[in-house]
């Protein structure tokens, strides 16, 4: 029994010591002032001119930030929206996020360039899936005990394909929050840039977000 206990506890102990041994700056990075990542200034101005954006930016109950500001610098190159797929004709703006942390509601804006298409010439559904996964999780994180979690399941109902050079908006809302489990629903649609346009529904989604029991130790490890 003693040997069995040692085999089970030694890897966990080594993992914890390994993380704790690294400097705090390496583990968390710096969240100071950062330069906004943007390639397409005209798209950014179009978003800011919409009534929806103006309504959100003037709401004192919402946290307003850009996607790249939500995580340490050393992780940028591995993050899809502002790393792997950020560039000319790809993701051309740093996604703009408005988050109601208390009620678990999120609205975020993206621009999808010409190089994000599939063989049919429309935006690849993998891009849509990534936006939905990351966005719905961001809405649910604040309602978890440690504010961290992993996707347990993600279901997506694709309605229409987004054309290239689309500006899209994600709407997400927590439907259930109980202990270490949060259920979020949301949808992605195109953003009308003038009153004569109507939004095109791209996809609807449901995400189950859970916090593993051992995530609570991240708090004192400062990860």
From Swiss-Prot:
One of its GO terms (cellular component) is mitochondrion. Its main location: mitochondrion. Residues 1-12 form a transit peptide. InterPro entries: HotDog_dom_sf, PTE-AB_protein, Thioestr_dom. It is found in: Mitochondrion. Keywords: Mitochondrion, Transit peptide. It comes from the Eukaryota. SUPFAM superfamilies: Thioesterase/thiol ester dehydrase-isomerase. PANTHER family: MIOREX COMPLEX COMPONENT 3, UPF0644 PROTEIN PB2B4.06. This is Uncharacterized protein CAWG_04269, mitochondrial.
């Amino acid at each position: 029994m003693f040997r069995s206990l040692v085999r089970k506890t030694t890897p966990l102990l080594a993992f914890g010591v390994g993380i704790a041994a690294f400097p705090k700056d390496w583990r968390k990075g710096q969240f100071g002032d950062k330069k906004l990542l943007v390639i397409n200034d005209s798209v950014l101005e179009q978003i800011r001119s919409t009534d929806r954006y103006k309504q959100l930016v003037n709401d004192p109950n919402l946290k307003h930030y850009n996607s790249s500001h939500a995580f340490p610098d050393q992780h940028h190159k591995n993050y899809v929206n502002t790393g792997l797929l950020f560039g000319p004709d790809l993701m051309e703006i740093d996604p703009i996020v408005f988050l109601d942390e208390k009620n678990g509601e999120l609205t975020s804006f993206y621009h999808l360039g010409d190089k994000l298409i599939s063989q049919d010439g429309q935006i690849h559904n993998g891009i849509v899936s990534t936006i939905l996964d990351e966005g719905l999780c961001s809405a649910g994180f604040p309602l978890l005990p440690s504010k961290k979690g992993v996707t347990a399941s993600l279901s997506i109902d694709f309605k229409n394909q987004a054309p290239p050079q689309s500006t899209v908006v994600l709407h997400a809302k927590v439907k259930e929050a109980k202990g270490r489990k949060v259920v979020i629903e949301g949808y992605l649609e195109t953003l009308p840039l003038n009153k004569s346009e109507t939004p095109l529904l791209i996809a609807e989604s449901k995400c189950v977000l859970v916090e593993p029991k051992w995530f609570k130790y991240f708090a004192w490890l400062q990860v």
